[in-house]
Amino acid sequence: MYDNPWWYQDEIFNEEDINGYYGFVYCITNSTTSKKYIGRKYFWSFRKKKGHKRKSKQESDWKKYYGSCPELKEDIKKLGKEHFSREILSLHTTLGKTNYEETRLLFNHNVLTESSVDGTPAYYNSNILGRYYRKDYFQYLS
């Protein structure tokens, strides 16, 4: 088993559970503040080796992955990984289905506009698709 594992349907998710899946959509939750991050990760990376024409398939760093958000990474560094739970929300067989489901959930969960009781953002996510930004939404309201 690996440190602070991913959970899927109340069970620890391991390599043998990957089967034919290409990637997953996940939620990382800060147990101290309840702040969340929704993202996606692929199980595989495809790289062209020097001097080769074909791409080779390699397992990605999905077991160690904690998202790409700088604010989330900073909180993990400050509080420690043990204060964050990692849940796989859905598994997908293609890159396109993985990306679509991530985007759908980001909008459905209102990650750019949802606030905690204290008025701070409920999600670490600060943008969707690099096109829609939390800061733009709140500027619009003021």
Over which residues does each language-model region extend?
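Structure-specific nucleic-acid interaction/processing domains
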Residues: 1-142
